[in-house]
Amino acid sequence: MKSKTYETHFPPLSAEQLAENRKKKVICGMSGGVDSSVSAFILQQQGYQVEGLFMKNWEEDDDTDYCTAAADLADAQAVCDKLGIKLHKINFAAEYWDNVFEHFLQEYKAGRTPNPDILCNKEIKFKAFLDYAAEDLGADYIATGHYVRRGEKDGQCQLLRGLDNNKDQSYFLYTLSKDQVAQSLFPVGEIEKPIVRAIAEDLGLATAKKKDSTGICFIGERKFKDFLARYLPAQPGEIRTVEGKVVGRHDGLMYHTLGQRKGLGIGGVKGMGEDPFYVVEKDLVNNVLVVAQGHDNSALLSSGLIASQLHWVDRQPIRQPVRCTVKTRYRQEDIPCEIQPINDETIRVVFDEPQIAVTPGQSAVFYQGEICLGGGVIETQIK
């Protein structure tokens, strides 16, 4: 199989490199999406012995309103058949429930807003999958369709941002160690998304026009509020302004996140002007959602944050202040900051300029240029 788009964007490898790659077995995680499909093809073109693996991480109910695992598996199988590679199948639903989903629920109960995709990468894709591929399938490497790159300095692997700035997924992979990065290949991290689609169309792959998945992996396209209500009982309460004025009611604190504007159900409040309301605090003790008016309200701003559950890609704790940039949510512009270590497990992060909607439970991920240093979970804001 050939792709002119591939040949345009990937220079041919030397005979020596091809010969070396042919000795290596790569298990490519096949999600049934276009990124993993093209990743498998790129690896084939680079000479590797490629096999696919489809992971089922969630036991579904009877809801058929979103893209099911069965449909994704069919797409993954169709791509593997087209490429002429074997597809393995594995069920990690028990591991997912124990190591990802239960933590997700606990965080929501505690009033925080977790990011299960980060935990899924840590516990499933780069732990359970990596271990299974190496130990049971004899893999030299695993590969995924993530938009990140591998770098190397002084013989140590580094995690780099994906070439496509709009699709870079290093934010979700900051928990990887340098050793996990060394065992992983990220073929589409070297190109931009439109090129990935063009390669898939050149090859006539079943996933060429399949839209990108959105939402949390185990919820799919369903309404988040309806899904969460099945597992956590909601506790309705008051919505108050910072000054204490009652302006509405909420269905449950867990349905709201800091900085949220839409979906609060607050109409025009007499004597309070037309500026929209934003969530600035979740008062768990009193079950009150605290709001303030105006996107530039000082109550929305933080001068920094405290983070814990730290993961550094090189696995070396930070002992001295470090200048870098940080993202406190995906696709955010880089924020210049200084990391100030409190101890090996906790850091203070001071922003150069105040930032809005710094959300406990989300991750703060740090960069120096293209290099992802690692990150941690936001514990509190610093006002």
From Swiss-Prot:
Q: Does the keyword Metal-binding apply?
A: no
Q: Name one GO biological process term.
A: tRNA wobble position uridine thiolation
Q: Where is this region: Interaction with target base in tRNA?
A: 115-117
Positions contributing to ATP binding = 29-36, 55, 145
Q: Which residues form the active site?
A: 120 (nucleophile), 217 (cysteine persulfide intermediate)
Top-level taxon in the UniProt lineage: Bacteria
GO cellular component terms given for this protein = cytoplasm
Report disulfide bridges, numbered on this chain: 120-217
Q: Which HAMAP family match?
A: tRNA_thiouridyl_MnmA
Q: Matching PANTHER family, A to Z?
A: MITOCHONDRIAL TRNA-SPECIFIC 2-THIOURIDYLASE 1, TRNA 5-METHYLAMINOMETHYL-2-THIOURIDYLATE -METHYLTRANSFERASE
Q: Which purpose does this protein serve, as stated in its record?
A: Catalyzes the 2-thiolation of uridine at the wobble position (U34) of tRNA, leading to the formation of s(2)U34.
Q: What is this protein called?
A: tRNA-specific 2-thiouridylase MnmA
Instruction: Give the organism's phylogenetic lineage.
Output: Bacteria, Pseudomonadati, Pseudomonadota, Gammaproteobacteria, Pasteurellales
